[in-house]
Curated annotation (Swiss-Prot):
One Gene Ontology biological process: iron-sulfur cluster assembly
Free-text function comment from the UniProt entry: Involved in iron-sulfur (Fe-S) cluster assembly. May act as a regulator of Fe-S biogenesis.
SUPFAM superfamilies documented for this protein: Frataxin/Nqo15-like
Gene designation: cyaY
Organism: Salmonella paratyphi A (strain AKU_12601)
Keyword RNA-binding: no
Name of this chain's protein: Iron-sulfur cluster assembly protein CyaY
Length: 106
């Protein structure tokens, strides 16, 4: 994968998250902000989830209240390099915990 392909795929990830939150109808308020390639989700309780791209490694990094995760593209899925879980699984787990209600991005 070259750098432009990596950015195209990361942009698609960001767009999916942003579109899901734009149509979010849950009770919790979840704000989404994108600044310089970093996507920040802010929750009512003051906690945050930060998602950024590591261009030199062609990885997407996810920082949650619980832990940090690094994802490599395997086929068409971003997979955690430690646990083997998908990006969407770990993002939904963290967002659900931090929002206090079920959050889905798929």
């Amino acid at each position: 994968m070259n750098d432009s392909e990596f950015h195209r795929l990361a942009d698609a990830l960001w767009l999916t998250i942003e579109e899901c939150l734009d149509s979010w109808d849950g009770d919790s308020d979840i704000d989404c902000e994108i600044n310089g390639g970093v996507l920040t989700l802010s929750f009512e309780n003051g906690s945050k989830i930060i998602i950024n791209r590591q261009e030199p490694l062609h990885q997407v990094w996810l920082a949650t209240k619980q832990s940090g995760y690094h994802f490599d593209l395997k086929g068409d899925e971003w997979i955690c390099d430690r646990s083997g879980e998908t990006f969407w699984e770990l993002l939904e787990q963290a967002a659900t915990q931090q929002a206090g209600e079920k959050v889905s991005f798929r």
